[in-house]
């Protein structure tokens, strides 16, 4: 019998196929595994990432939606809120409840009402406006703040590379 998580993910995938959302596309990495999705984010207009096609893997836990998925870019990504291994660091992907380090309110963290669509729109928003207050990539955050030209060059390289890979 299918689990609550797999049924919910099947429904979300079906909804996204029927009603695509601007800015990203999503599908399964392997048709037999509803818990691992392949997503492509289109670099948002009027941002440094414009024109890019950034691939990522979204991995859902067995107890979804009670726990958040992880999202990891497989395309090169230079951003203050993306770890060097590609993992995305935004509040809504952090486990529910209080933040042990005190940076985030519980209301900013994961809740079961989030969907693939709301996660992807949050990531697109992150690309539009990095949060350099609690960075995953300290070097990118420093460049974003202090050496914007260097930051832009690195992002431009990522965009060009993503276009070549697409």
Curated annotation (Swiss-Prot):
Pfam families, alphabetized: UQ_con
Keywords: Acetylation, ATP-binding, Nucleotide-binding, Transferase, Ubl conjugation pathway
Catalytic center residues: 89
Catalytic activity: S-ubiquitinyl-[E1 ubiquitin-activating enzyme]-L-cysteine + [E2 ubiquitin-conjugating enzyme]-L-cysteine = [E1 ubiquitin-activating enzyme]-L-cysteine + S-ubiquitinyl-[E2 ubiquitin-conjugating enzyme]-L-cysteine
GO terms, biological process: protein ubiquitination
PANTHER family linked to this entry: UBIQUITIN-CONJUGATING ENZYME E2
Annotated function: Accepts the ubiquitin from the E1 complex and catalyzes its covalent attachment to other proteins. Involved in the formation of multiubiquitin chains. Signal the protein for selective degradation.
UBC core domain segment(s): 4-164
The protein's name in its UniProt record: Ubiquitin-conjugating enzyme E2 7
Gene Ontology terms for molecular function: ATP binding; ubiquitin conjugating enzyme activity
Gene encoding the protein: UBC7
Pathway: Protein modification; protein ubiquitination
Residues modified as N-acetylalanine: 2
EC number: 2.3.2.23
UniProt lineage: Eukaryota, Viridiplantae, Streptophyta, Embryophyta, Tracheophyta
Family: Belongs to the ubiquitin-conjugating enzyme family.
InterPro entries per the UniProt record, alphabetical: Ub_conjugating_enzyme (IPR050113), UBQ-conjugat_E2_core (IPR000608), UBQ-conjugating_AS (IPR023313), UBQ-conjugating_enzyme/RWD (IPR016135)
């Amino acid at each position: 019998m299918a689990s609550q998580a797999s049924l919910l993910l099947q429904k979300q995938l079906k909804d996204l196929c029927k009603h695509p959302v601007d800015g990203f596309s999503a599908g399964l990495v392997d048709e037999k595994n509803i818990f691992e999705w392949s997503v492509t984010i289109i670099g948002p207009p009027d941002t440094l990432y414009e024109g890019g096609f950034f691939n990522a893997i979204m991995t859902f836990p067995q107890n979804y939606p009670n726990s958040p998925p992880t999202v990891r870019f497989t395309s090169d990504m230079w951003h203050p809120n993306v770890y060097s291994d590609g993992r995305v660091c935004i509040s809504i992907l952090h486990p529910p409840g209080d933040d042990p380090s005190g940076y985030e309110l519980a209301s900013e963290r994961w809740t079961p009402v989030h969907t693939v669509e709301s996660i992807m729109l949050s990531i697109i928003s992150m690309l539009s406006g990095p949060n350099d207050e609690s960075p995953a990539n300290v070097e990118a955050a420093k460049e974003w703040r202090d050496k914007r030209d260097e930051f832009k060059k690195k992002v431009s390289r990522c965009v060009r590379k993503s276009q070549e890979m697409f």
